[in-house]
Amino acid sequence: SVSLYFYNSLITREHYHDVSECFNRINLVEMRHLDIFGELALKLGTDPRLWSYNKGRMYYWCPGCNQYPTQIHALLTNALEGEIQAIRKYHAQSEWIEDGHIRSILNRIIADEELHVKIFRSLLSEFSMPEPETHSEPAESPEPTTQVPT
């Protein structure tokens, strides 16, 4: 989420300054989470690279893993869904991890992510305009608030 929220803060800055600031502030929390996970990996004797294990191999994370919507509603929905997925993942991990200290860290991070969910839901309610239909040409609209200018 760090790279995505950085991107989102940039493309929303000019026309949605408050949204941009929310992404900046939430991103600071997400960077702290990344730091916590990195330090935890080191303490557990693991290399803190940005990679994951899948089907017997290590795969590096890259920004191409992100989705980059530019419609304000889709952008906020994507961020909200990412937070919800993270909460589910951390809950699942806390179920099988036996170390109480690590579970406590996960629970603290879950609390942060739940706050982010509330923030994104609040922002979505402010921008509750329907998205233009993708199967037809969008009509000219005098209201430029549905798409983040690029």
Please place each PLM-identified region on the residue numbering.
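Non-heme di-metal
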Residues: S1-T150
